């Protein structure tokens, strides 16, 4: 409740839309697939939650790393309580994504990052990410974590 949520690789937005239904203050979606964005836009319209949501169309790294004007001008000091990261299962740069979140200072001090990975993914997560819980659902592994205070 009352959370600012960033949904990276949001697809059709099921996670972020669920957050709005649970009283999130604002959900920001970043997705590059045009078909997924069209479905997301229709869902937002049907649910009448346009004022609680914002969609950015494009590559996550481009939008955040390149200091995309539309993203950072929209809410210059925006920090998120919850960041959901659902990159394609074959995407191996999850640590780059975590480090980008750190570099851009997107997570609030007590914020949580949720990673959605394939259950068989064996990756060594950056030392700046502390796993606080893991769940397996079918082929999915959900990892809940926090950034350590010593993050660069």
Question: What are the residue ranges of the model-derived segments?
Answer:
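Class I S-adenosyl-L-methionine-dependent methyltransferase catalytic core
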Residues: 1-152
């Amino acid at each position: 409740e009352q959370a600012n949520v960033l949904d990276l690789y949001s697809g059709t937005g099921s996670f972020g839309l669920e957050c709005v239904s649970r009283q999130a203050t604002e959900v920001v979606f970043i997705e590059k697939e045009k078909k997924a964005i069209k479905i997301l836009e229709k869902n937002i319209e049907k649910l009448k939650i346009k004022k609680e949501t914002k969609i950015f169309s494009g590559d996550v790294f481009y939008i955040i790393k390149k200091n995309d004007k539309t993203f950072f001008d929209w809410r210059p000091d925006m920090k998120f309580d919850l960041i959901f990261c659902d990159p394609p299962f074959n995407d191996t740069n999850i640590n780059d994504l975590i480090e980008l979140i750190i570099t851009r200072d997107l997570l609030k001090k007590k914020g949580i990052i949720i990673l959605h990975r394939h259950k068989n993914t064996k990756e060594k997560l950056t030392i700046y990410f502390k796993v606080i819980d893991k769940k397996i659902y079918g082929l999915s592994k959900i990892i809940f974590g926090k950034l350590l205070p010593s993050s660069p």
